[in-house]
């Protein structure tokens, strides 16, 4: 319109008389106004969506699908609308009741801690009334309880303070049921565990071990006195807690309570990492500096020793443990009592190439190597499921033995070592499937060994058992005719179990009597044993789901082409299609890949969940894809071990191949393919963008990533990469180093917490420096002050997911296109 006005103003005045000129001026002004109105109306009409007359029309940003159901949103996910309820039973751990198992457990009901029986609903024994008690004038809250095996006393923790991921300090008390009295053990106690005979409690305070007598109601002896800020007794240091035990316990009672085995961990030679905290106290003008002993790849590990303490004579002895250690470092990965006087100890060298198993005789005070095994190109994964099998002549078990998990035919299977002092074993299971974690439980009355495996599918978990006398005669416990992921916990005598169905449908829990001869093939879930009752049906969740259009997962095995040997690359995957998906649309849907991809991990498993991926599918109208590429677990040793010494290579290739497949689909917009990952997934996101160079993945979102494996802890990293000294080139290639390739993507996002004690913020800072040095600018950064690896401090968890969703929306809207 501006150009039109200029033309009018240049008309020569002499062609008009004054009146005509004034009239023409008025007409021109009116005309201009009319043109402006018409032009504005056209623009307005163009901005309004064209409504169809069909009743199922919805606005593009509607909260409803075409069939009138609600879409999944962050608000309902965050308030746990779709979170199934699960219950844990604290089974009474008393071996004396094995032959008369009533399924006793401790629970909180009717404002009391009580002992109940799954077999006899009328059984009710009150242990403690209420969740508070008064001690020395203070009103204290019960935060956790552990009943003594004889049910006469309770071990209570209060004033809990979180330490690292698995560890907590607290004040511990013993409640005596007969006298209704509370006796304090101590404050700032790191660990407290009942002896199996209910007489004593071993506890750790100031990194020393003490014995508290429940009978005399006092601490009667100190087991150690050399504990310090760098010497840990009975309690793991940071790396043993995080990577070895995944627990806060490094002390183990013998079955009768006569001995206590424990680790003495010396981290004096371990390098120190300082983490600054900026917003802990608003009054602070200087950061609070916290120190952590953190062994990085190729640097000294903590030195661990096994000690055994005798309750009878009050002495400790240190059995000699040595093995094939290339550099003098030894990891003690598992300690298991195999009888009252013998301890089985698993060790590996620091790179997990050699497994050495020792048998310690606590009476003779000797140690012998009973197994010495190579990983044969893979690695020894740390496990904690070695299961003691007691001698029983009736069932042809003349010696104490144990069941362990071993690679048999390239897959993880059960092996029965009939004599704990021998390396000879009986193969219990075999085939192209895997036992998950290890043996689950042993029913000595029935000679049954229970386990969970992928026998039906690597994306499912079903419960089975075998009789030790009949190897490979596998009996199904759960119904394999239906897809399912199951778990089970057993009562002391293994007669009863809490069977938990985790998906893919709505989860439930029920109590099963596995000694019942009635096989309930018509019953939902189990085909063995009698279902007594449901502990949880999640009926409220089932009702809620009727109102929502939850995008469904579709599981499949993707063929990503041929590997270097000409074999098909078959990987597990699932996709989530958006609501009202229309495959006839062309170049329409963005694809949001979510990846983790760490060695021996698994994301593609048929559990029930409604979370961030479903929000993305619903709110961004995107296809969500998850691919478990090579290196991940439960598809055999060859599939997972080829990533050894070259992390980030095959994993990234497989994500790229999957993106190429999806980009070729007619309904996918190949310019809108993104990848998101956290932790190892954050690392994999950056490595994939680096290797892809913008060909398939146009966007990436990386949260708390490792960017250089020299910066991560030694125990995890060296298991898959060896040391930097042994594998220098591998560490260079596995780092995120070719940052100019990331510049070929449209844009990427980096987020990290500054207080991350696991994947240090150092990783992101070093990466950002590389970007600066190479002039790479196509990225965004968000830093979360003082947040650890979970990114939760000061509302950070809300922000991190809001940011991810908003950033992905902007990417798919084309706001980052160069």
UniProtKB/Swiss-Prot annotation:
Belongs to the peptidase S9B family. The chain crosses the membrane at residues 30-45. Residues 1-29 are cytoplasmic. This is Dipeptidyl aminopeptidase B. GO terms for molecular function: aminopeptidase activity; dipeptidyl-peptidase activity; serine-type endopeptidase activity. The gene is DAP2. Its EC number is 3.4.14.-. SUPFAM superfamilies: alpha/beta-Hydrolases, DPP6 N-terminal domain-like. One of its GO terms (biological process) is protein processing. Glycans are attached at residues 63, 79, 110, 139, 372, 392, 421, 738. Residues 46-818 are lumenal. It is found in: Vacuole membrane. It is a single-pass type II membrane protein. Keywords: Aminopeptidase, Glycoprotein, Hydrolase, Membrane, Protease, Serine protease, Signal-anchor, Transmembrane, Transmembrane helix, Vacuole. The lineage of its organism: Eukaryota, Fungi, Dikarya, Ascomycota, Saccharomycotina. It is an enzyme of class 3 (hydrolase). GO terms for cellular component: fungal-type vacuole membrane; plasma membrane. The active site is at residues 679, 756, 789.
């Amino acid at each position: 319109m501006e150009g039109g006005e200029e033309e009018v103003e240049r008309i020569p005045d002499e062609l008009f008389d004054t009146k005509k000129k004034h009239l023409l001026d008025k007409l021109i002004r009116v005309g201009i106004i009319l043109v402006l109105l018409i032009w504005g109306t056209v623009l307005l009409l163009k901005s309004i969506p064209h409504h169809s007359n069909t009743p199922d029309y919805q606005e593009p940003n509607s909260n409803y699908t075409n069939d009138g159901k609600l879409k999944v949103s962050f608000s309902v996910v965050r308030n746990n609308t779709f979170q199934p309820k699960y219950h844990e039973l604290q089974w009474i751990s008393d071996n004396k009741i094995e032959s008369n198992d009533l399924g006793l457990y401790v629970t909180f009901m009717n404002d009391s801690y009580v002992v109940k029986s799954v077999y006899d609903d009328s059984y009710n024994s009150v242990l403690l009334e209420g969740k508070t008690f008064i001690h020395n004038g203070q009103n204290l809250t019960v935060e956790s309880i552990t009943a003594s095996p004889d049910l006469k006393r309770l071990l209570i923790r209060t004033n809990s303070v979180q330490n690292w991921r698995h560890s907590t300090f607290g004040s511990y008390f013993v409640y005596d049921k007969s006298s209704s009295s509370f006796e304090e053990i101590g404050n700032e106690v790191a660990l407290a565990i009942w002896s199996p005979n209910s007489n004593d409690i071993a506890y750790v305070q100031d990194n020393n071990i003490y014995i508290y007598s429940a009978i005399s109601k006092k601490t009667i002896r100190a087991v150690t006195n050399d504990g310090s800020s760098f010497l840990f007794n009975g309690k793991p240091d940071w790396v043993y807690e995080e990577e070895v035990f995944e627990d806060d316990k490094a002390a183990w009672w013998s079955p009768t309570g006569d001995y206590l085995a424990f680790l003495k961990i010396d981290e004096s030679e371990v390098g120190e990492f300082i983490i600054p905290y900026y917003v802990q106290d608003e009054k602070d003008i200087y950061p609070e500096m916290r120190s952590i002993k953190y062994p990085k790849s190729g640097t000294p590990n903590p030195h661990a020793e096994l000690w055994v303490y005798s309750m009878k004579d009050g002495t400790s002895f240190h059995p000699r443990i040595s093995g094939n250690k290339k550099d003098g470092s030894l990891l003690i990965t598992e300690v298991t009592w195999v009888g009252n006087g013998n301890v089985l100890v698993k060790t590996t060298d620091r790179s997990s190439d050699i497994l050495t198993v020792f048998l310690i005789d606590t009476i003779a005070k000797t140690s012998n190597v009973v197994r010495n095994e190579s990983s044969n190109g893979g690695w020894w994964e740390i496990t904690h499921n070695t299961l003691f099998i007691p001698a029983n002549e009736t069932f042809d078990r003349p010696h104490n033995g144990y069941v362990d998990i071993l690679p048999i035919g390239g897959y993880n299977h059960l092996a029965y070592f009939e004599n704990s002092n021998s390396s000879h074993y009986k193969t219990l299971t075999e085939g192209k499937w895997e036992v998950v974690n290890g043996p689950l439980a042993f029913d000595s009355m029935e000679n049954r060994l229970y386990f969970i495996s992928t026998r039906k599918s690597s994306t499912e978990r079903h419960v089975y058992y075998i009789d030790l006398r009949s190897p490979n005669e596998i009996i199904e416990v759960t119904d394999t005719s239906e897809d399912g992921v199951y778990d089970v916990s057993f009562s002391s005598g293994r007669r009863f179990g809490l069977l938990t169905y985790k998906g893919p449908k709505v989860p439930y829990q029920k109590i099963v009597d596995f000694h019942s001869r009635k096989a309930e093939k018509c019953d939902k879930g189990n085909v063995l044993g009698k279902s007594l009752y449901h502990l949880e049906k999640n009926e409220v969740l089932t009702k809620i789901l009727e109102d929502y259009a939850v995008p469904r997962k579709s599981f499949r095995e993707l063929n990503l082409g041929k590997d270097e040997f000409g074999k098909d690359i078959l990987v597990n995957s699932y996709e989530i299609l958006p609501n009202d998906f229309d495959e006839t649309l062309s170049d329409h849907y963005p694809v949001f890949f979510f990846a983790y991809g760490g060695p021996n991990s698994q994301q593609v498993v048929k559990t029930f969940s409604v979370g961030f991926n479903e929000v993305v599918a619903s709110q961004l109208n995107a296809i969500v894809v998850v691919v478990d590429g090579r290196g991940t677990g439960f598809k055999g040793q060859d599939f997972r071990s080829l990533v050894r010494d070259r992390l980030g290579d095959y994993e990234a290739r497989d994500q790229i191949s999957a993106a190429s497949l999806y980009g070729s689909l007619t309904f996918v917009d190949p310019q809108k393919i993104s990848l998101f990952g956290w932790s190892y997934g954050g690392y994999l996101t950056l490595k994939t963008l680096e290797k892809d160079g913008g060909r398939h993945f146009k966007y990436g979102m990386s949260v708390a990533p490792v960017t250089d494996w020299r910066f991560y802890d030694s125990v995890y990293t060296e298991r898959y990469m060896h040391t930097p000294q042994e594998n220098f080139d591998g560490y260079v290639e596995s780092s995120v180093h070719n940052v100019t390739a990331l510049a070929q993507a449209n844009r990427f996002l980096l987020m990290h917490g500054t207080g991350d004690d696991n994947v240090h913020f150092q990783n992101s800072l070093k990466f950002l420096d590389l970007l600066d040095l190479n002039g790479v600018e196509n990225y965004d950064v968000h830093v979360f002050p003082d947040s650890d690896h979970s990114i939760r401090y000061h509302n950070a968890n809300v922000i991190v997911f809001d940011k991810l969703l908003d950033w992905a929306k902007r990417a798919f809207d084309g706001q980052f296109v160069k």
